[in-house]
């Protein structure tokens, strides 16, 4: 089976055989062999050969190809949404919004490029100071499984727009979505070698990251893999590395008037996408006392009624499955570990269908757990911590190595100002779900959540490097020579 796309041609992988599965039915959706180190090297060479011609195209010419890609996405929107839902387990209503985000990324990226990395000039004495940007060259993009279309797209589109050529290594859990996306690029008329698809698992990723022919690597995924890449690129200032990783994100609840609004926002923050968004709330900080008790009682009651089901279930569920049976089991193990160390179950996370990766929402009070593990539990398991005062809540929110997202639900603007000033996170929301983000804003965090290369609207920054120039059309002597210089 031809699973790799290199130099404008489909070819069979020669590496390890792997499959993707529907996480609920466990039916095989895609099967193929990954790329070997030799095939990775062939793809890098193809991207290098394609780079000069692609980079020399005008910006408008590259935009035309990107616009054609958007047209192709729209034409295949239903097929792509179904593919995303089937391979990730997320409901069709949600996978359809992912395709819409992929389409919208084109215009957003063009706007961002012009604003952040376009051309600017200003007079400076008898010359003109000009700022332009150049592409890095050949870049690798490592995509995640939770948004297998939208998140790789967030790197690939601005990288191509800037004039780079790309080697795309998707998650081995979502190869079918990647293949369909690349076919849309082909339909858009992208020249051979400009985008190459390298399917495979860990060995393929290691070979690509280690290949000396790449000029940069853009990664979205786990902190563990991101840290390994950061160590691998240590001592290589000649290569650009952009890491977008996860978080142990806190959502602080103040004593608000509308408890139902708070409950709805908490659910949208913690359980949407079955808790598989980088910005999902992992820790819910609730005030001690009767009001906090009432909030948690209402949250548990509503969360227990959330519909969980297969991606194509009708009526549509709120939550689909997590990505795999292995992931579901790991989350259930994490819940058992917390309970064994003093956590109290408020709402048990369950596996309603044996042999399927469906999980119901779980809520556990970990206030009494000593040395709580500072890890990202990537699923629908929310940890509650009770606090005695607002200063203590902020301290608890910041008690993490991560720094991706933090949020406050409060009727007090003064408290939000304090929270914003003292929070250490790249995304800080007030009375909005943590999983909401503006397309016109950067997306990224600090600490173990990234390496200060925010993506989304700021992706243009790491896709090109600035070139500053002083220019004048004629070479003339200055009116006054520098002291000590004699020309006669």
From Swiss-Prot:
<feature type="binding site">
    <location>
        <begin position="221"/>
        <end position="226"/>
    </location>
    <ligand>
        <name>NAD(+)</name>
    </ligand>
</feature>
<dbReference type="InterPro" id="IPR017649">
    <property type="entry name" value="SuccinylGlu_semiald_DH_AstD"/>
</dbReference>
<dbReference type="InterPro" id="IPR029510">
    <property type="entry name" value="Ald_DH_CS_GLU"/>
</dbReference>
<dbReference type="InterPro" id="IPR016161">
    <property type="entry name" value="Ald_DH/histidinol_DH"/>
</dbReference>
<dbReference type="GO" id="GO:0043824">
    <property type="term" value="F:succinylglutamate-semialdehyde dehydrogenase activity"/>
</dbReference>
<dbReference type="GO" id="GO:0019545">
    <property type="term" value="P:arginine catabolic process to succinate"/>
</dbReference>
<dbReference type="GO" id="GO:0019544">
    <property type="term" value="P:arginine catabolic process to glutamate"/>
</dbReference>
<comment type="similarity">
    <text>Belongs to the aldehyde dehydrogenase family. AstD subfamily.</text>
</comment>
<keyword id="KW-0520">NAD</keyword>
<keyword id="KW-0560">Oxidoreductase</keyword>
<dbReference type="InterPro" id="IPR016163">
    <property type="entry name" value="Ald_DH_C"/>
</dbReference>
<dbReference type="Pfam" id="PF00171">
    <property type="entry name" value="Aldedh"/>
</dbReference>
<feature type="active site">
    <location>
        <position position="244"/>
    </location>
</feature>
<protein>
    <recommendedName>
        <fullName>N-succinylglutamate 5-semialdehyde dehydrogenase</fullName>
        <ecNumber>1.2.1.71</ecNumber>
    </recommendedName>
</protein>
<comment type="pathway">
    <text>Amino-acid degradation; L-arginine degradation via AST pathway; L-glutamate and succinate from L-arginine: step 4/5.</text>
</comment>
<keyword id="KW-0056">Arginine metabolism</keyword>
<comment type="function">
    <text>Catalyzes the NAD-dependent reduction of succinylglutamate semialdehyde into succinylglutamate.</text>
</comment>
<dbReference type="InterPro" id="IPR015590">
    <property type="entry name" value="Aldehyde_DH_dom"/>
</dbReference>
<dbReference type="InterPro" id="IPR016160">
    <property type="entry name" value="Ald_DH_CS_CYS"/>
</dbReference>
<dbReference type="InterPro" id="IPR016162">
    <property type="entry name" value="Ald_DH_N"/>
</dbReference>
<feature type="active site">
    <location>
        <position position="278"/>
    </location>
</feature>
